[in-house]
Amino acid sequence: MDLLFGRRKTPEELLRQNQRALNRAMRELDRERQKLETQEKKIIADIKKMAKQGQMDAVRIMAKDLVRTRRYVRKFVLMRANIQAVSLKIQTLKSNNSMAQAMKGVTKAMGTMNRQLKLPQIQKIMMEFERQAEIMDMKEEMMNDAIDDAMGDEEDEEESDAVVSQVLDELGLSLTDELSNLPSTGGSLSVAAGGKKAEAAASALADADADLEERLKNLRRD
């Protein structure tokens, strides 16, 4: 019947049903063949027994029976082979149908993804990503430059001191000894000269403060 619980069977259910029927038929053929093979052995034993007793008429009759039995065995073997071939074809159909269903699902999913992936939007997203990446690179470069400017002098001074110390160590001297051995400039600096230098430094500092104050006023007016 093509109906199952009031509904029509699917192709997969029909294939499974036919597959079970074919397997059942092959098992029945195997049982019948085994019975005939057992009967064949018994007929051969009876033929030998009757031949020893000299009952040749019975031997001829049993020989014909043996021929028929062997013919039936060959028929059962051939029938089973044909049924097995049909069973393999059904299995191939099931596999092909399963593959077709899987391909159908994959094709549907691919179509959905292609509809969702819109090329202009993707291009816009990629352009925005590149722009943000460039901004990030610029900010990182500016921060690195600022850090280098802030730390550069101190690092250079430390490296210079390290080089001087290394050279003096190689010469077996110390930085303190070298500084103490520097020649004097011919006496101490006069108070007047020191005062002039202090006044010059104070004047330069005042000028710098005035310039900074003027810039701040200009910024407030703007």
Curated annotation (Swiss-Prot):
Coiled-coil residue windows: 12-53, 195-222
The UniProt record lists the keyword Acetylation: yes
Residues the record lists as Phosphoserine modifications: 184, 188, 190, 203
Impact after mutating residue 216 to A: Diminishes interaction with VTA1
Residues bearing PTM Phosphothreonine: 185
InterPro entries: Snf7_fam
Positions occupied by motif MIT-interacting motif: 210-220
Positions of the UniProt region annotated as Interaction with VPS4B: 56-222
Highest taxon above the source species: Eukaryota
Keywords from the named record: Acetylation, Coiled coil, Endosome, Host-virus interaction, Membrane, Nucleus, Phosphoprotein, Protein transport, Transport, Ubl conjugation
Membrane topology type: Peripheral membrane protein
Post-translational modification, as annotated: ISGylated in a CHMP5-dependent manner. Isgylation weakens and inhibits its interactions with VPS4A and VTA1 respectively.
Molecular function, one GO term: phosphatidylcholine binding
Main location: membrane
Record-level GO BP terms: autophagosome maturation; autophagy; endosome transport via multivesicular body sorting pathway; ESCRT III complex disassembly; establishment of protein localization; exit from mitosis; late endosome to lysosome transport; late endosome to vacuole transport
Region (Interaction with VTA1): 217-222
Location of this chain's protein in the cell: Late endosome membrane; Nucleus envelope
Entry-annotated residues carrying N-acetylmethionine: 1
Note on domains (UniProt): The acidic C-terminus and the basic N-termminus are thought to render the protein in a closed, soluble and inactive conformation through an autoinhibitory intramolecular interaction. The open and active conformation, which enables membrane binding and oligomerization, is achieved by interaction with other cellular binding partners, probably including other ESCRT components.
Miscellaneous: Its overexpression strongly inhibits HIV-1 release.
Similarity section: Belongs to the SNF7 family.
Assembly information from the UniProt record: Probable core component of the endosomal sorting required for transport complex III (ESCRT-III). ESCRT-III components are thought to multimerize to form a flat lattice on the perimeter membrane of the endosome. Several assembly forms of ESCRT-III may exist that interact and act sequentially. In vitro, heteromerizes with CHMP3 (but not CHMP4) to form helical tubular structures that expose membrane-interacting sites on the outside whereas VPS4B can associate on the inside of the tubule. Interacts with CHMP1B, CHMP2B, CHMP3, CHMP4A, CHMP4B, CHMP4C and CHMP5.
Alphabetized PANTHER family for the sequence: CHARGED MULTIVESICULAR BODY PROTEIN
Annotated protein name in UniProt: Charged multivesicular body protein 2a
